Amino acid sequence: MGKKEQYDMYSVEMEREGDGAMDVKVMKKNKASKKKEKLESMKKEMDINDHEITVEELEQKYTTSVSKGLKSAFAAEVILRDGPNELKPPKGTPEYIKFARQLAGGLQCLMWVAAVICLIAFGIEESQGDLTSADNLYLAITLIAVVVVTGCFGYYQEFKSTNIIASFKNLVPQQATVVRDGDKFQINANQLVVGDLVEIKGGDRVPADIRIITSQGCKVDNSSLTGESEPQTRSPEYTHESPLETRNIAFFSTMCLEGTATGIIINTGDRTIIGRIATLASGVGNEKTPIAIEIEHFVDIIAGLAIFFGATFFVVAMVIGYTFLRAMVFFMAIVVAYVPEGLLATVTVCLSLTAKRLARKNCVVKNLEAVETLGSTSVICSDKTGTLTQNRMTVSHLWFDNHIHSADTTEDQSGQSFDQTSDTWRALSKVVSLCNRAFFKSGQDGIPVPKRIVIGDASETALVKFSEITVGNVMEYRERFKKVTEVPFNSTNKFQLSIHELQDPLDLRYLMVMKGAPERILERCSTIMIKGQELPLDEQWKEAFQTAYMDLGGLGERVLGFCHLYLNEKEYSRGFNFDTEEMNFPTSGLCFAGLISMIDPPRATVPDAVMKCRTAGIRVIMVTGDHPITAKAIAASVGIISEGSETVEDIAARLRIPVEQVNKRDARACVINGGQLKEMSSEELVEALKLHPEMVFARTSPQQKLIIVESCQKLGAIVAVTGDGVNDSPALKKADIGVAMGIAGSDAAKNAADMILLDDNFASIVTGVEQGRLIFDNLKKSIAYTLTKNIPELAPYLIYITASVPLPLGCITILFIELCTDIFPSVSLAYERAESDIMHLKPRNPRRDRLVNEALAVYSYFQIGIIQSFAGFVDYFTVMAQEGWFPAYVLGLRSHWENQHLQDLQDSYGQEWTFSQRLYQQYTCYTVFFISYEICQISDVLIRKTRRLSVFQQGFFRNKVLVIAIVFQLCLGNFLCYCPGMPNVFNFMPIRFQWWLVPLPFGILIFVYDEIRKLGVRRHPGSWFDKEMYY
């Protein structure tokens, strides 16, 4: 018995014994390990040989017949064994658990504790009949409201990420045509089983993974699975050892574009290629974003410090002689003062604002935290088709008259490089226009040709558009050359031909035109047209053809050959019955007209975007399902492989030595295909990524895309992945940020992604990177501003407990600071423009460049925070002194001050104060401390505009939102001070004008002090001063 079997049996025995917690623990561990094993097995390439074995072996393997299909009774047994042909959704977390998690984070737990203490304190005070305010009750309600509101928002954000499996279900066909017991009928696709004989036709979705048995011109769209934009022929022939590339396998959910086929089902449900992708997509990912990790790190520090200081003050209070309840209230007050209740709201609003800015630039952000993640990105793994390229085949080059010409596909033809009056071009253009089944959708006369919709495959679409631009109206042209018959392209002949009558009614000959694979077309020709004359196709011209063919193929372009033949009018007179099955007409001895190559061209904005990424220290890796030659050519044209960079193969060709003799370290670029990647270990892949800065992966499977992303992450990279197909969804989910295409993207890709590009343009990602970097800088400024207030909020309680003075600042006042006056200035910093060209800096290192570092904390707490505390205490003691309470007299006064029964407490002048008068004076002190803090925070928000540049260089009033926030802050301060009723509700009092002026010198000091700091940082980059003072 194997080790795993023993383990499984052990878990069952434990369950039977009912040994409590151990039973559950072992079973959970077993379940988790099974899930991990299943996920790892899904990452491996599908290991099947159903495409390699003979039809007879296939029948024997699945107990079926290629003529009669399965027996119904046996099919019923198989469905009981394997289950229905559908994708099973993973077990999800209950919604109430998700919501509960949002209410129980690090900060939230602290705030719950503080709220409970407040309620207990209020309850005890009420039961004792003390004449106190309802501050503790208000505080508890406010804290609970903050936790619930932020929790609801967090839950909403999580809820928006819908179940990945749901999007895959849209790809599953509802009905399928099946043959059982020799009878053909339609059944629900989920009732299909392995071994069933099914039929598909143009317009159907393939109902499972099937081995093709018969085919008539069947073509399928594999683009969402493999990334190949061209329709793929499906036929019974075994053409490749890889099941993804052989022609005799059709995959579950792919669309049959044309033709018909029959096949035997070899996989159903979760065992199909699409099922494995769905399982991978739902099983990977869900890792925390860099900004979430940063905030969690910051929250842990804050929570730890809050508990430490709260506990310290609690112990000190107990030692000094305060009651347990009073000491607990101190603990609560310290927690409230130390915890930045408005931080989560500030971060969320800042990220939302950036997301809105990105939306205006065609980037829709699904996960707010992804905004900053994009700014941290150090590697972009980009799909080719539709992202780097335009996802439309376009004529690129032509070869005729022994010259390669670049094609101009613009309507004005101003850049055309060949003579359009040439006889050879006329002959070639005639073949291109006539030997083509594609046609324009009606009613598009006013639309530019490149934007018109064409009914036909990608290659023929490119050719018919080129003909329309160069020749004129193709449909009218075809009408002049009436088509008599045609032979569609098939995988055996590898050519397409059609026979036409000539437009001259006196010329009774037929014209036969043919196009197809260049080498197959050439072997059917005996002559070649050069400058309008037919010349014998000798070795010289064959060599010229081969050179041109290799040159065009080397550019990664798809090349087609064209030829024609005028049939003898005596042998093939008008009305001749052409038989396309028997081919009762010549298919050799034709005249070769030329070559035309096509390519899916790069988007115009991509090379510049790739260059910006390179400048920003971001590595762009191409990961595509397309051919290595095409992938390399596109990579070179957009700058992923830079000019002058060579692969190992390029170096070997240049030095004329075997590839094995080339030192891999000499090759800056590397192109790895799926077959090579399959043979590589994870260590070898990581080593290749380290060794070659410029990488291209071609012919990759969905599992391999996922492995590439994981390998980049092992190197410590923050990885962004772009994609549009179903095959991209596991990699999109696993990446630190997944970016899906909005136009060409599948639902599965969009659901797996964190961001969607509405214009499918790679250049939009660069905009996102820039905005992501900017928001990290601005969040740093916002948090520095937010943290500064912790010291002036904490210091009053420190002096209150240790020096026993009347409380300078109340909890309700602190909450107004946290949740009202400070929110707007901190959010306004999100609108601050960059200090420098942030796209010329390297991506931040998540392990080193923290959102909150030591320099930021020290500067905010112990420099600016201390100055603000001094401002508050100077104003506090000034107010007390002006009312008759000199500083020396105030020290140690707390117990008498708070004694409700003492109605004749004397001040420094001997004046007697009742408890209500003292309470009024205390609320006045709260207000004065609040106002002094507000004045200093105006200076604080101004200095936070920059971290290195002078504020004068950045500009005082360029950030209009910040100016509005400062005005709002001052207006709110005035409203709280002078609005009638505030003393009874929120304990704010009207204060004298001169008390507003006391903190002004401290505000000026903060500004001057920070300008000196920035000057030192700019003057001495890299010095100890820079390291300690630049945050």
Curated annotation (Swiss-Prot):
Q: Recorded E.C. number(s)?
A: 7.2.2.19
Describe, from its UniProt entry, the tissues in which this protein is expressed. Exclusively expressed in stomach mucosa.
Q: Which residues lie on this side of the membrane: Cytoplasmic?
A: 2-94, 160-295, 346-779, 831-850, 946-959, 1015-1031
Keyword set, alphabetical order:
ATP-binding, Hydrogen ion transport, Ion transport, Magnesium, Membrane, Metal-binding, Nucleotide-binding, Phosphoprotein, Potassium, Potassium transport, Translocase, Transmembrane, Transmembrane helix, Transport
Cross-referenced CDD domains: P-type_ATPase_Na-K_like
Catalytic residues, per the record, are 383
Chain segments annotated as transmembrane: 95-115, 139-159, 296-315, 328-345, 780-799, 810-830, 851-873, 926-945, 960-978, 994-1014
Q: Which domain of life is it from?
A: Eukaryota
Catalytic reactions of this protein: K(+)(out) + ATP + H2O + H(+)(in) = K(+)(in) + ADP + phosphate + 2 H(+)(out)
What biological processes does GO assign it?
intracellular potassium ion homeostasis; intracellular sodium ion homeostasis; potassium ion import across plasma membrane; proton transmembrane transport; sodium ion export across plasma membrane
Record-level GO cellular component terms? plasma membrane
Give the Polar residues compositional bias ranges: 221-236
Translocase as a keyword?
yes
Disulphide-bridged cysteine pairs: none
By its UniProt entry, which Pfam families does this protein fall under?
A: Cation_ATPase (PF13246), Cation_ATPase_C (PF00689), Cation_ATPase_N (PF00690), E1-E2_ATPase (PF00122), Hydrolase (PF00702)
Q: Which family does it belong to?
A: Belongs to the cation transport ATPase (P-type) (TC 3.A.3) family. Type IIC subfamily.
Subunit comment: Composed of two subunits: alpha (catalytic) and beta.
Quote the function comment for this protein: Catalyzes the hydrolysis of ATP coupled with the exchange of H(+) and K(+) ions across the plasma membrane. Responsible for acid production in the stomach.
What is this protein's record name?
Answer: Potassium-transporting ATPase alpha chain 1
Q: Which organism is it from?
A: Xenopus laevis (African clawed frog)
Task: Tell me the organism's taxonomic lineage.
Answer: Eukaryota, Metazoa, Chordata, Craniata, Vertebrata
